[in-house]
Amino acid sequence: MRQGGEGQCISAELPLMRQAMTRAQRPPAEEAPPLALGIPVHGRWTARNGPATKVPSHTHNLAQTYAIDLARRPAPEPVWLWPPARRPETYPSFGEPLLAPADGQVVTATDGQRDHLTRTSLAGLLYVLPEAFVRSIGLPRHLLGNHLILDLGDGAYAVLAHLRRRSLKVAVGDRVTAGQPLAECGNSGNSAEPHLHFQLMSGPDVTSAHGLRFTWRYQDGDGREHQGVPADNTCVVPVPNAPKDPPASYAP
């Protein structure tokens, strides 16, 4: 659970929830050089549940081996008793623009699921555990919520999940360019509070693809620049105009 302070944050997808979600574990694809991508947000965010801290960062299921979550800070402190839930609009992540991490084409676009109340209290925790199990036995979209899948070429596909309802600015078949606004951050699907779930994978179908590695260029809270993936509870500020590395091929 999150303690006070900007760098400390409650997990939006708790370990027990991830266990409930995991059915057939899928091993990652053969190691390939990580693909350099743009960070799909503006401003100051906090990383959590990322592969710099643990692999798999979430689970191998649904190609989440190297997935990462980003949340805007500061956010309301979690409370044990009251209020039992908050409206997603009270969180700074909610409604933030989400951007294309690279040039590509939209292959999946859904935004019809509602943005539910947050699950950051004791009552919310007791509710979200069985809810996560119910979601896990349904379709992947019940876990991902509203989401986009982008074909980045060379066998790499990016997923942006938990989008705000009715916020899509693109449709299936659209070509997008790096940095283009795609949608807004929301709280749909398996999400305790508004945040972005991002992952890279080897195919357009999360049930059969494998997770792939990626790197970002960013500054931490002290202004130091990094090329890689931020560790959990690290401040992430995208560095603009990052040089584009030659794309690595992930095709079998």
Where on the chain are the PLM-derived regions?
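Short, charged beta-turn/beta-strand-edge "cap" motif at the junction between a beta-strand
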Residues: 53, 76, 112-114, 181-191
